[in-house]
Amino acid sequence: MEKTNRKIGIMGGTFDPIHIGHLILGEAAYEQFGLDEVWFLPAGNPPHKRNRAGRAKDAQRVEMVRRAIASNPHFVLCTKEMKDEDYTYSYRTLEAMRKEHPGTEFYFIIGADSLFYFDEWKNPERICAAAKILVATRDRAKEKELLACMERNAKKLHGTFLKLDTPNLDVSSHELREWIREGKSVKYYLPDSVISYIQEQKIYQD
């Protein structure tokens, strides 16, 4: 029987590829908010990223996440969105999780950059009804602006927005894909298990 009153963090993303920034963010959320687990949720067909040319296949993205989190007992791979044939939306996923796991409190992790257009997402008020929103801080100089936006969204969407303190790691999946194509080293930016898989599968090298 599933434990009730669990606190679960949800880390969604295309993870193309998953990198140390994602892992550090997940661990920070786990520690700061006393979570039981952090679920890594590879996106299926997000409406804003429909063009997958030059990217990893879905199965490859899943395998990279599996390898990246394998050594962490409180990190969990969740392939829920990969099973959805339709375009995926966060509110649908979170509402389905609430139904499947009653008594569980969900914490949806987003980056500070996403916060500023969060109210433009599909049904953001339903996301807020299904989960508390953890906002990862990045640029300390913009903290005042960030807190003001969190407060505005909380009032407008009737949600709970909480600040997640994280180191300012300037790394992106897009940049790492370019480096791999150019033959540059990505050591320490990606787990070794992910690097070896990318090399074996020749991902991003076209």
Regions found by a protein language model. Name each.
Residues 1-206:
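Nucleotidyltransferase catalytic core that binds NTPs
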